[in-house]
C-alpha cells in the first residue's frame, strides 16, 4: 500500500495538491475516486445494459477472441494491486471482469468493435497515464519505484488492448475474415471519429473516375427493415388520428421519431460533450490571459498547453461522432419518406391528380427536409449552450449582460414573426414547382408526339412561363429568408458593442473583457445558428405537411367482390372485398357484373349504366361499341380501377389473383424487349418463344441488331406503335393468368398482323384456347369483323348503355343491331378457316447465351455513356470553372463585382473590431487615455453595423438577383436543349434522367446554390480576417502560414477529386429512381392488374438504396474534411497557446485577440465546409445542366438554322432522292440492320393525296418522321436529298419546320390535368368561337359540355377514349390550317402539307368516315400523306348508311406500300388492285374480311 506521508494533501480530496510536486498535480484520493471508482461504476452499469441488448440479437460472428480476453484479464489484477482503498480494488476487479465479458459478447453479436469498451479503455488509459505520473513523482522508496514500474507496464498493456479493441474483427488474426460488411459498419469508435474508414474511397477517387459499383453498399440497418418499421408506425399513427378524429399536422413527424428513436438519440451524447468543450474554450482564454497578466509558476503553462490539446482535440472527435450519427439519421429519414411516397403511389386511383406530385415530393420536398433537419439537434444544443453562456456572462460582467440579452430577445421576436409566414410562402412555392415538374415530365414523356404535332415552341414557351411564375412565387420566401438571416447575424455583430458600452470602466481589464467577448461569442453564435435554422426548419415542416397530406389521400377502393368456397382470404390483395360465395357463380364463370354503373367524375355522370355481364372461362367475350361508348371504362371497371361505381362486380378467386391487361396505350418499360415481355414472371423459355411467335414479334426481333436484348427507350421510343402494342400483348400472354382483358389491342395494326394475332391468339384454335387452364378473355373493339368467333358478344351504344348481348347464333336469328353493324361495315361472313393462310414467320432462333452476351455488352456501353455524360473524366475529378461562367453568364458584371466587394468588406469589418478592441484596451490601461470611451465604442459599433449592411447587400444580390436571373436563364437553356434534341437522344437517355434535370437539379440551383454561395463567400472572407488576427497575435504563427496554406491546398485538392465525383454520382444515381416513379405512374393499371406491386416495391427499395449510397458517402466525405480542418484548428490553437505562454512577449492584447479569433475561426471553418459542401453539390447540378445545354445532340447546328418564307410550304411538293436513315445516332458505321429506311426515292406532286400502307414495323411512320426532320438521314446524304417546295429541309429550323407542316400523330398529347380545353388548343387558336366551331365539326362539343359546359372548363384527358383523343388531334390540325389562312396578310396559295400517322386507328367505322370527310373538306388543296392500316377508305368514300361502289372516286389518288424501309409498290389504288399478285391487293383483300 502506498503511504501519503510525502505529501499530506494526498489524503484529502483536493483536487489539487499543495506544497508538493510543484503544486501541479491531483491528489491521490481525488485520482482514486475520479479516475478509478467513478468510471468503473458507470462502465459496469452500462456493460450490463449493453450485454442485455446484445444477447437479444442473433449471433453473426465466428472465430476466437481468447487472446484479447486474456490480455484484458492479465491487465485487471495488475491494475488493482496498486489501489489502496478496498472499494477501488473491488470495483477494479469488477470492471476487469465486465471488460472481458463485454468483449466476448461484442465479438459474437456485433459487427463492429465495441464503442462502449473502446471509449472506456481509451479514457481510462488517459487517466492511468496521469495517475502513473503521480506515482512516479510521489515515489521515494524502492518499493514505491517498483510499484510504479509495474503500473507503467499495466498502462502499456492497456494501450495494446486499446489498439486491439479498435481493430475491425475481420482484420484480427483470430477474427472471421469471411464476414463482408461496409467499412463503417465494422469500424470502431476511433475509426468513426477520424473517418479513417473512408481512406480507401478517398484514395480510389483520387486515382480514378468513380462509378456506382466502386461505392460500398449501405449498412444493413438502412435497408428495408427500417422502411418497413416506418410504414407500420405511420399507418398506426394515421389510423389512431383518424379514429380519434384528430387533424394534427405532425403525425408524420411522430411516426418518424418513433421509428428512428435510437438513431435520433445517438447524436445527443457527443453534442452534449461539444457544449462542455465549447464553454471550456472561454475559460481557457481566461486562464491564458490571467497567466500572462499575473505571476504564476511556469509549470502552469504546460497545463494550459495540455488543456488546449484536450479541449480542441475533444472538439474534433466529438464533432466527427456527432455528424456521423446525424448524417446517418438524415439518410434514414430520406429513405423512409421516399419509400412511403412510392408505396402510396401504388395505392392511388387512376384519376388522382396527386400521382404526378410523387416525383416532386421525393426530390424537391425531401431535399428541403434534409436541409431543414441538418441543424435539428443544433436547436436544443444551441439553446442549452446559449443559456449556460448567458449565466457565465452574467457572472463575468454583471448587470451589463442585460444589454445583449435584450438584443437577443428582440431577435427571437423577429424570428418568430418571420417563421409564421415561411410555411405559407413555402407551400405556394412548392406548389408552383410541382406544377412545373408535372408539365415538364408530361412533355418529355410525349416528346415524340409533341414534335410531330409541331407544338414544341408553344409548349416550350408555356413551360418557361411556368418557370418564371415559379421564380416570382419564390420572392416571398426569399425575402423572408433574407430577413431571417439578417436577424441571425444581428446579435453576433452588434451585441459586443452594446455590451462594451454597458460595461463599467473598473471592469475594463484585458482578461475580463476578452473572457466576456468569448462568452458572448458562445452566446450569440449558437443563437445566430438557431435564427438561421428557423427558416429552413419551417420549410422542412411545410414539406413534411405536403408529404403527410399526400400519404393521407384516399387510396384506391376496389369495389369488386372475390368469391370462393372457403373463407380463406390469404390470396386476396389490396382493398378487394372477399366473401365466401356471396352470389351463385358457376365454376365456369370468371366475372359477373350485376346491375352496375361506372363513371369517372361522379355517380350522377356515369359512363356506363345498368350493365349486366358474365365472363366465362375458356371463352372470348367481345365488347363492341362506337367511340366514347365506355368500352375502356368497362375494362377498367373489371380491374376495379373506376372511382365511382354502383351494383356489383364479382370475380372468381382464380381470376382475381393476376389479370393480364393490355391498355389502348401500351405500357412499355425502358428496358429490353425480353424484359418487357417477361416482366416479373418466372422465366419459361418454351412459353416465351410461344408468345413471341403468337404475337408476330419474331420477324421484328430478327431485324433488330440486338434482337430481344434491344433497349426500347422511355415509353418504347424506338418502336413503332404496332410493335409496342404487340409487346404488350406478348406480356399479357406470357403472364400465368386465368383472366385477360384486352382493350382494343388490334387497332393500329396492319391487316395481316391483325389477322395473324386473332388467329394465333384469340380464335377457337388460338394459343389461349389451347392452354390447359384456358383463361377468360375480355376483348373490346369498335369493329364487328371478329364478332362471329366470339363466344359472347356485348354491344354498347354511344350513351354507355347495353343494346344487346348474347352469342353470334343468338344475335343473328333476328334483326339485331349487330347485323346492322355488319352491313354498315360490309363485313364478310367468311370463317377464319377459309382465309388464305398467313405466311408462317420464321421461328425465332436466338439462344439465351447470345441474348445475355448482347445485353451485357449493352450494359457496358451504357455504363461508359453514363460516365461520360454530364462531364468528361477530367472534369469529374478536377472540376470545371466554366460551370461558374455558365451560371453567372446572365448576371451583369457590376452585380458580380458588387457581390465580391460586399463579401470581402464583411470579412474585414467582422474581424477588424478585435484589433480595434486591443488598441482600445491599451489606451484604457494607460495612465492618460488619448480618447474617451465613447470614441472607441462608437467606431467599434460602426464597424459592426457596416459589416451587417455588407452582409445584407451580399444576401440581396445572391438571393433575389442571381437566383432569379440565372435560374430563368439556366432553365431556358436546358429546356431549349431538350426540346431541340434529336429523337435518338430520348431513346438512349432515360426519362427519369431528363426529368431529374428539371426537378432536383433545378431545385438545387434555385434554393441551395444562392444560400450556400452567401454562406461560403461570407465565411471565407471572415476566416481570412480571423487568420490576420491570429497572425497579429504571434509573428511566429504568421511565419507558418505558407506551410498551412500548402497543407490546406493539398487536403482540399485530395478531397475535391473524390467529392466532385460523388456529387455527380449522387445526382445521377437518383435518375433511375425518378424513372421508376414515372414508369409506375404511366403503367399503374397494368402493374396492379398483374399483381406486380410487390415486385415494383422491392425494385424501388433497391433503386432507393443505390441512390442513397453516393449521397451518404458524400456527406461522410464532407465530414472527413471538417475533421481535418478541426484538427488543423487544434494545431493552430496548440501553437498559439504554446507561443504566447512560452515566449510571453506579445502582451495580453494581441494574445486575447488571437484566442478570440481562434474560437471564431473554428466555427467559420465549420461553416465553410458546410456551405462549400452544399455549393459543390449545387454546382454539380449546374455542371449537369451545362453539359446538357452544350450537348452535341442537336437537331440542327446552333446558329445555322434556315427560316423559310412565311407562306412556305404553299404547294406541298416533295422530293426524296436515295435517302437511308436510322434511329441510331449520326454514325456512318451504323449496322444496316438498324436502317429504318433504305435508299428511299419518292416524288410527290403538289395536292396529291397519298396513302402509305404496309405491315407494322415496315417503316411507314419513319417516312413521316423523315419529312419532319425527326429521323435524320445518314451523314453522307446530300444536303438537297430531301426538299419540300424546292427548299431542303435539312437546315430548316426543326421547330419551325414542324409548325409549317401540319401533322397529326397517332397518340395525341395534352397539357397536364387541370388545363382547359381552350389552353390545350390555344397554341393554334385564333379565338374561342373558332375553337368551338372546329370541335363541333369533329363531334367533340358534346364532350366539352359534359365536362363543364364551355372551353374554359378543365379538360380531363383520362376520361377521353382513344378515339376521342384522335378526334382532338385532327381538330388541332384543322385549327392550325384556319389560323394559317387568317395570318396571311396577302393573298397566297392555300396549299400546304398535311401528314397523318394512323389518325383513325382507334375509331369506329362511322367516326372514321367523319374524319375523312373533314380532311377532304378542310385540306382539299393540300398535299395529304396518311399512314394507315385500314384500307377501306383508300379505294372508296363512305357515308353514313350509304356506300359508293365506284373505286375510281376514292379519297386517295396514290398508294405507297412499304416493306423493310423500302417502297415496294407505288401507284393509283385502282391500278394496284388490278395486280393479283401485288402487295396492296393482298392487303386490301385481307381487309375485306
Swiss-Prot record:
Localisation per UniProt entry: Cell membrane
Glycosylation sites: 612, 616, 670
Reported phenotype of the disruption mutant: Does not affect the production of fumonisins B1 and B2, but strongly decreases the production of fumonisin B3. Causes overproduction of fumonisin B1 in the mycelium and supernatant. Increases the expression of FUM8, FUM17 and FUM18.
Occurrences of domain ABC transporter (ranges): 591-823, 1214-1485
ABC transmembrane type-1 domain span: 272-539, 902-1187
Transmembrane segments: 33-53, 84-104, 116-136, 143-163, 264-284, 302-322, 373-393, 397-417, 482-502, 511-531, 890-910, 945-965, 977-999, 1031-1051, 1120-1140, 1149-1169
Biased composition regions of type Polar residues, renumbered to the chain: 863-874
Positions of ATP binding: 625-632, 1254-1261
A molecular-function term among this protein's GO annotations: ABC-type transporter activity
Effect of mutating residue 1397 to K: Does not rescue the FUM19 deletion phenotype of increased FB1 expression
Highest rank taxon of the organism: Eukaryota
Region (Disordered): 852-874
Family statement: Belongs to the ABC transporter superfamily. ABCC family. Conjugate transporter (TC 3.A.1.208) subfamily.
PANTHER family given in the database record: ABC MULTIDRUG TRANSPORTER (EUROFUNG), ATP-BINDING CASSETTE SUB-FAMILY C
Function as written in the Swiss-Prot or TrEMBL entry: ABC transporter that may provide the dual role of fumonisin export and self-protection by allowing the fungus to evade the harmful effect of its own fumonisin production. Plays a role in the repression of the gene cluster that mediates fumonisin biosynthesis.
Name recorded for this polypeptide: ABC transporter FUM19
Organism of derivation: Gibberella moniliformis (strain M3125 / FGSC 7600) (Maize ear and stalk rot fungus)
Amino acid at each position: 500500500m502506498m503511504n501519503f506521508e510525502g505529501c499530506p494533501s494526498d489524503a484529502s480530496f483536493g483536487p489539487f495538491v499543495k506544497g508538493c510536486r510543484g503544486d501541479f498535480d491531483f491528489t491521490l484520493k481525488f485520482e482514486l475516486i475520479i479516475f478509478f471508482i467513478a468510471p468503473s461504476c458507470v462502465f459496469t452499469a452500462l456493460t450490463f445494459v449493453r450485454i442485455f441488448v446484445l444477447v437479444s440479437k442473433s449471433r453473426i460472428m465466428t472465430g476466437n477472441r481468447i487472446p484479447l480476453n486474456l490480455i484484458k484479464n492479465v491487465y485487471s489484477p495488475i491494475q488493482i494491486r496498486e489501489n489502496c482503498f478496498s472499494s477501488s480494488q473491488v470495483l477494479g476487479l469488477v470492471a476487469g471482469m465486465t471488460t472481458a465479458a463485454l468483449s466476448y459478447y461484442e465479438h459474437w453479436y456485433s459487427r463492429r468493435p465495441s464503442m462502449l469498451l473502446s471509449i472506456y479503455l481509451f479514457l481510462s488509459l488517459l487517466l492511468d497515464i496521469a495517475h502513473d505520473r503521480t506515482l512516479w513523482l510521489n515515489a521515494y522508496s524502492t518499493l514505491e519505484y517498483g510499484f510504479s514500474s509495474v503500473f507503467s507496464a499495466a498502462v502499456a498493456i492497456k494501450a495494446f488492448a486499446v489498439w486491439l479493441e479498435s481493430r475491425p474483427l475481420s482484420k484480427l488474426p483470430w477474427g472471421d475474415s469471411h464476414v463482408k460488411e461496409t467499412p463503417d459498419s465494422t469500424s470502431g469508435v476511433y475509426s468513426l471519429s477520424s473517418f479513417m474508414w473512408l481512406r480507401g474511397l478517398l484514395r480510389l477517387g483520387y486515382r480514378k473516375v468513380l462509378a456506382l459499383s466502386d461505392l460500398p453498399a449501405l449498412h444493413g440497418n438502412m435497408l428495408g427493415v427500417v422502411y418497413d418499421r416506418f410504414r407500420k408506425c405511420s399507418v398506426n399513427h394515421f389510423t389512431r388520428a383518424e379514429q380519434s378524429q384528430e387533424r394534427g399536422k405532425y403525425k408524420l413527424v411522430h411516426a418518424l421519431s418513433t421509428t428512428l428513436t435510437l438513431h435520433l438519440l445517438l447524436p445527443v451524447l457527443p453534442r452534449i460533450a461539444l457544449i462542455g468543450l465549447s464553454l471550456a474554450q472561454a475559460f481557457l482564454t481566461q486562464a491564458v490571459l490571467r497567466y500572462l497578466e499575473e505571476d504564476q509558476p511556469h509549470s502552469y503553462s504546460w497545463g494550459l498547453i495540455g488543456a488546449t490539446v484536450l479541449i480542441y482535440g475533444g472538439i474534433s472527435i466529438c464533432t466527427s461522432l456527432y455528424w456521423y450519427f446525424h448524417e446517418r439519421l438524415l439518410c434514414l429519414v430520406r429513405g423512409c419518406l421516399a419509400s412511403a411516397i412510392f408505396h402510396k403511389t401504388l395505392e392511388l386511383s387512376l384519376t388522382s391528380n396527386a400521382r404526378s406530385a410523387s416525383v416532386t415530393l421525393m426530390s424537391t420536398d425531401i431535399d428541403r427536409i434534409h436541409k431543414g433537419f441538418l441543424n435539428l439537434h443544433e436547436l436544443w444544443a444551441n439553446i442549452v449552450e446559449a443559456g449556460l453562456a448567458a449565466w457565465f456572462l452574467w457572472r463575468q460582467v454583471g448587470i451589463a449582460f442585460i444589454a445583449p440579452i435584450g438584443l437577443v430577445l428582440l431577435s427571437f421576436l423577429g424570428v418568430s414573426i418571420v417563421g409564421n409566414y415561411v410555411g405559407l410562402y413555402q407551400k405556394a412555392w412548392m406548389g408552383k414547382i410541382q406544377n412545373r415538374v408535372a408539365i415538364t415530365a408530361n412533355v418529355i414523356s410525349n416528346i415524340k408526339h409533341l414534335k410531330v404535332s409541331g407544338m414544341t415552341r408553344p409548349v416550350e414557351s408555356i413551360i418557361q412561363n411556368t418557370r418564371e411564375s415559379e421564380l416570382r412565387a419564390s420572392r416571398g420566401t426569399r425575402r423572408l429568408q433574407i430577413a431571417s438571416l439578417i436577424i441571425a447575424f444581428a446579435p453576433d455583430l452588434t451585441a459586443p458593442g452594446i455590451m462594451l458600452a454597458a460595461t463599467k470602466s473598473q471592469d475594463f481589464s484585458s482578461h475580463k473583457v476578452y473572457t466576456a467577448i468569448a462568452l458572448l461569442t458562445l452566446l450569440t453564435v449558437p443563437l445566430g445558428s438557431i435564427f438561421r435554422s428557423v427558416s429552413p426548419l419551417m420549410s422542412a415542416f411545410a414539406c413534411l405537411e405536403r408529404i403527410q397530406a399526400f400519404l393521407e389521400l384516399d387510396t384506391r377502393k376496389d369495389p369488386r367482390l372475390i368469391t370462393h368456397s372457403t373463407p380463406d382470404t390469404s390470396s386476396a390483395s389490396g382493398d378487394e372485398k372477399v366473401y365466401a360465395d356471396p352470389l351463385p357463380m358457376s365454376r365456369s364463370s370468371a366475372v359477373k357484373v350485376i346491375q352496375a354503373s361506372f363513371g369517372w367524375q361522379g355517380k350522377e355522370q356515369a359512363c356506363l349504366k345498368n350493365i349486366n355481364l358474365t365472363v366465362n372461362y375458356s371463352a372470348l367475350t367481345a365488347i363492341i361499341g362506337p367511340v366514347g361508348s365506355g368500352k375502356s371504362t368497362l375494362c377498367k371497371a373489371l380491374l376495379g380501377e373506376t372511382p365511382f361505381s354502383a351494383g356489383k362486380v364479382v370475380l372468381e378467386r382464380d381470376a382475381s389473383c393476376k389479370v393480364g391487361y393490355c391498355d389502348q396505350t401500351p405500357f412499355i418499360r425502358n428496358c429490353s424487349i425480353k424484359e418487357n415481355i417477361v416482366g416479373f414472371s418466372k422465366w419459361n423459355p418454351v412459353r416465351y418463344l410461344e408468345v413471341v411467335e403468337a404475337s408476330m414479334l419474331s420477324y421484328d426481333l430478327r431485324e433488330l441488331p440486338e434482337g430481344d436484348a434491344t433497349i426500347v427507350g422511355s415509353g418504347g421510343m424506338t418502336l413503332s406503335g404496332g410493335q409496342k402494342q404487340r409487346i404488350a400483348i406478348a406480356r399479357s400472354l406470357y403472364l400465368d393468368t386465368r383472366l385477360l382483358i384486352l382493350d382494343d389491342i388490334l387497332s393500329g395494326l396492319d391487316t395481316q398482323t391483325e389477322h395473324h394475332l386473332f388467329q394465333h391468339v384469340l380464335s377457337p384454335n388460338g394459343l389461349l384456347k389451347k392452354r390447359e387452364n384456358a383463361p377468360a378473355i375480355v376483348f373490346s373493339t369498335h369493329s364487328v369483323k371478329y364478332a362471329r368467333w366470339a363466344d359472347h358478344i356485348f354491344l354498347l351504344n354511344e350513351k354507355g348503355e347495353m343494346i344487346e348481348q348474347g352469342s353470334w347464333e343468338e344475335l343473328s336469328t333476328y334483326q339485331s343491331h349487330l347485323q346492322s353493324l355488319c352491313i354498315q361495315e360490309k363485313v364478310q361472313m367468311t370463317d377464319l378457316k377459309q382465309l388464305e393462310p398467313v405466311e408462317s414467320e420464321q421461328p425465332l432462333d436466338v439462344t439465351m447465351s447470345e441474348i445475355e452476351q448482347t445485353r451485357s455488352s449493352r450494359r457496358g456501353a451504357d455504363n461508359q455513356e453514363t460516365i461520360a455524360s454530364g462531364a468528361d473524366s477530367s472534369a469529374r475529378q478536377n472540376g470545371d470553372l466554366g460551370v461558374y461562367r455558365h451560371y453567372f453568364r446572365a448576371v451583369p458584371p457590376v452585380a458580380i463585382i458588387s457581390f465580391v466587394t460586399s463579401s470581402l468588406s464583411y470579412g474585414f469589418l467582422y474581424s477588424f473590431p478585435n484589433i480595434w478592441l486591443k488598441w482600445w484596451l491599451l489606451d484604457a490601461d494607460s495612465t492618460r487615455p488619448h480618447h474617451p470611451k465613447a470614441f472607441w465604442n462608437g467606431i467599434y459599433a460602426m464597424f459592426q453595423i457596416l459589416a451587417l449592411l455588407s452582409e445584407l447587400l451580399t444576401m440581396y444580390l445572391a438571393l433575389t438577383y442571381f437566383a432569379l436571373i440565372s435560374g430563368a436563364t439556366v432553365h431556358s437553356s436546358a429546356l431549349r436543349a431538350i426540346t431541340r434534341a434529336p429523337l435518338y437522344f430520348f431513346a438512349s437517355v432515360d426519362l427519369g434522367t431528363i426529368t431529374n434535370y428539371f426537378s432536383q437539379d433545378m431545385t438545387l440551383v434555385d434554393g441551395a446554390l444562392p444560400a450556400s454561395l452567401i454562406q461560403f463567400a461570407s465565411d471565407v472572407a471572415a476566416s481570412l480576417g480571423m487568420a490576420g488576427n491570429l497572425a497579429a497575435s504571434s509573428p511566429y504563427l504568421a511565419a507558418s502560414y505558407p506551410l498551412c496554406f500548402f497543407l490546406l491546398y493539398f487536403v482540399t485538392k485530395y478531397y475535391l477529386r473524390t467529392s466532385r465525383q460523388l456529387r455527380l454520382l449522387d445526382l445521377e444515381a437518383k435518375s433511375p429512381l425518378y424513372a421508376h416513379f414515372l414508369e409506375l405512374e404511366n403503367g399503374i393499371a397494368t402493374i396492379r392488374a398483374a399483381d406486380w406491386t410487390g415486385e415494383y416495391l422491392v425494385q424501388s427499395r433497391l433503386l432507393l438504396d443505390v441512390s442513397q449510397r453516393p449521397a451518404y458517402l458524400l456527406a461522410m466525405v464532407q465530414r472527413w474534411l471538417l475533421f481535418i480542418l478541426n484538427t488543423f484548428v487544434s494545431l493552430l490553437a496548440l501553437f498559439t497557446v504554446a507561443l504566447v505562454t512560452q515566449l510571453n512577449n506579445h502582451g495580453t492584447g494581441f494574445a486575447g485577440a488571437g484566442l478570440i479569433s481562434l474560437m471564431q475561426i473554428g466555427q467559420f471553418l465549420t461553416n465553410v465546409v458546410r456551405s462549400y459542401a452544399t455549393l459543390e453539390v449545387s454546382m454539380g447540378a449546374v455542371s449537369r445542366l451545362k453539359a446538357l445545354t452544350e450537348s452535341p445532340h442537336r437537331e440542327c447546328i446552333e446558329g445555322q438554322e434556315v427560316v423559310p418564307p412565311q407562306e412556305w410550304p404553299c404547294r406541298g411538293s416533295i422530293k426524296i432522292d436515295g435517302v437511308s436513315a436510322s434511329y441510331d445516332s449520326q454514325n456512318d458505321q451504323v449496322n444496316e440492320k438498324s436502317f429504318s429506311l433504305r435508299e428511299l426515292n419518292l416524288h410527290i406532286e403538289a395536292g396529291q393525296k397519298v396513302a402509305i400502307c404496309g405491315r407494322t414495323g415496315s417503316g411507314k411512320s419513319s417516312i413521316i418522321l423523315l419529312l419532319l426532320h425527326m429521323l435524320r438521314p445518314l451523314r453522307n446524304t446530300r444536303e438537297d436529298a430531301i426538299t419540300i417546295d424546292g427548299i431542303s429541309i435539312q437546315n430548316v429550323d426543326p421547330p419551325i419546320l414542324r409548325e409549317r407542316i401540319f401533322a397529326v400523330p397517332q397518340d395525341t398529347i395534352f397539357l397536364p390535368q387541370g388545363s382547359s380545353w381552350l389552353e390545350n388548343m390555344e397554341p393554334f387558336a385564333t379565338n374561342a368561337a373558332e375553337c368551338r366551331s372546329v370541335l363541333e365539326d369533329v363531334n367533340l362539343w358534346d364532350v366539352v359540355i359534359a365536362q363543364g359546359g364551355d372551353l374554359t372548363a378543365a379538360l380531363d384527358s383520362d376520361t377521353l377514349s382513344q378515339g376521342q383523343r384522335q378526334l382532338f388531334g385532327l381538330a388541332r390540325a384543322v385549327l392550325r390550317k384556319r389560323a394559317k389562312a387568317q395570318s396571311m396578310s396577302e393573298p397566297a396559295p392555300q396549299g400546304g402539307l398535311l401528314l397523318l400517322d394512323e389518325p383513325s386507328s382507334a375509331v369506329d367505322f362511322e367516326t372514321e368516315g367523319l374524319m375523312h370527310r373533314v380532311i377532304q373538306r378542310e385540306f382539299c388543296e393540300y398535299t395529304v400523306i396518311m399512314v394507315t392500316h385500314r384500307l377501306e377508305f383508300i379505294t372508296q368514300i363512305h357515308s353514313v348508311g350509304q356506300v359508293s361502289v365506284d373505286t375510281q372516286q376514292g379519297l386517295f389518288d396514290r398508294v405507297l406500300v412499304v416493306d423493310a424501309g423500302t417502297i415496294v409498290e407505288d401507284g393509283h389504288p385502282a391500278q394496284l388492285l388490278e395486280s393479283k399478285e401485288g402487295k396492296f391487293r393482298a392487303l386490301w383483300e385481307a381487309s375485306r374480311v
